A protein has these predicted regions:
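Carbohydrate transferase catalytic cores enriched for Leloir-type hexosyltransferases
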Residues: 1-418
């Protein structure tokens, strides 16, 4: 029986539907759920001070039988106050002054939690391992040398493209500066492992393993007409049009503007009038403004930017799309194409970084910066129904090679050997 302290901070915001619910959030959540279900694991939850309040409610609702290493239940009133302010903060996010006021209140309460919430030292004395799916290993864990420490690292993209995400670079530096020679690192792809070894050769040694991510079990083909009609109506997608689907953050690295421009060219070149593009995902404000500058993309009724999509609506959107596009400039893994394949949707992705590890030969792979290859790929799928069916089937078979059960099984095996 392994006694694992799990840093569940990244999933504490499960109650808030915002752009924090990214691939890393879902990775942390699915690994947590699968570990909690295993009979050979005794799981203990840990939350950072700024996640304590939300964490106690997550535990009570989803993991009532899983103990927590902190005594947060003693401060339920403060937890409720924190959650209320957090809801207000989200609701006024677009208003700079109010956002600052509520943000300051949240920081003050986090400081209070860091001073009053105590760690159960008895549980630490019997713990075998500490697993962090995102954040650095807490300093207090280092005081217990018998606890083996494990981190899951996703990508070094802020170092590959430092100008695009300076905050991400700072975040990774903070993690890597805090690591010790005894830490064990899991990576979601060989590409990510190689990148970290390139940028942090003195930190990453032989204590590593590649353990791929997976799509949630809820992602499966949903061709129920009633469900699709409901989703179309909810996101204002024309009922009389076929659609291409994309899901990503609206950031430059995702190469979305190029993909959209090529789609418009493809439609105009071939005189097509029965298909549109549905672009979903959490928006980076500055990039969304850039997208709006491309008036030709938004003025002809071909592009529908639906923004954040509820989790329960994604299977229908994936499963009923003509094809899915994810021609990113660079990825650490690439979870959306895997979700699309698991829903029986043919995919088009770029042929770089980690994406070949995910898609293999189950989709069309192209150069991310080639307009010609984008247009050719769209034409192949639009004019060849058999190819769409063939790649949809290949995608389903490819997706079966990934599962959260396999991911967690590999993690536990490594922990048992170390």
């Amino acid at each position: 029986m392994l006694n694992i302290v799990y840093d569940a901070s990244v999933v504490a915001n499960i109650f808030y539907k915002n752009d924090n619910r990214s691939g890393i959030f879902f990775a942390g959540w699915n690994i947590l759920k699968k570990m909690a279900q295993r009979p050979d694991v005794n799981l203990i939850l840990y939350f950072r001070s700024d996640c304590c309040a939300d964490g106690i409610f997550l535990k009570e609702k989803f993991l009532p039988n899983t103990p927590c290493i902190q005594n947060m239940s003693n401060y339920m009133f403060l937890c409720k106050v924190y959650r209320k302010i957090h809801c207000w903060y989200d609701s006024v996010y677009c208003h700079l002054y109010l956002r600052k006021v509520f943000g300051l209140a949240l920081k003050m309460l986090s400081c209070v939690f860091s001073n009053i919430v105590k760690v159960d030292k008895k549980r630490l004395q019997t713990a075998d391992a500490f697993f962090s799916p995102v954040y650095k290993i807490p300093d207090f864990i280092r005081m217990y040398p018998h606890i083996k420490t494990y981190l899951y690292l996703y990508d070094a993209i802020p170092f590959v493209f430092p100008r695009l995400n300076p905050y991400g670079k700072k975040f990774i530096v903070e993690i890597m500066q805090s690591t010790k020679q005894t830490d064990f690192f899991f990576f979601d792809s060989c590409c990510s492992e190689n990148d970290f070894k390139t940028f942090f050769p003195s930190k990453i040694g032989y204590n590593t393993a590649v353990v791929p991510l997976a799509a949630d079990e809820t992602f499966k083909s949903d061709r129920n007409a009633q469900n699709l009609n409901s989703v179309r109506e909810k996101y204002h997608i024309p009922a009389n049009k076929k659609y291409v689907f994309s899901l990503s953050t609206f950031e430059p690295r995702k190469n979305l503007i190029r993909a959209l421009k090529c789609f418009v060219t493809f439609v105009e070149k071939n005189g097509i009038n029965d298909i549109v593009w549905v672009a979903a995902g959490a928006a980076w404000v500055s990039f969304y403004k850039e997208l709006k500058k491309e008036r030709a993309l938004l003025s002809n009724g071909l592009i529908f930017c639906v923004g954040y999509v509820d989790d329960e609506d994604l299977p229908a959107l994936y499963g009923n799309a003509e094809w899915f596009v994810y021609t990113s400039q660079y990825e650490g893994f690439g979870l959306p194409p895997l979700e699309a394949m698991q829903c029986g949707c043919p995919v088009i992705t770029s042929n770089n970084s980690s994406l070949p590890e995910v898609v293999d030969d189950a989709g069309i792979m192209i150069d991310w910066e080639s307009d010609e290859q984008h247009i050719e790929a769209y034409e192949k799928y639009y004019f060849n129904e058999e190819l769409r069916k063939e790649n949809a089937q290949k995608g389903l078979e490819r997706a079966r090679k990934f599962s959260w059960d396999k991911t967690v099984e590999e993690i536990i095996k490594k922990m048992e050997k170390c």
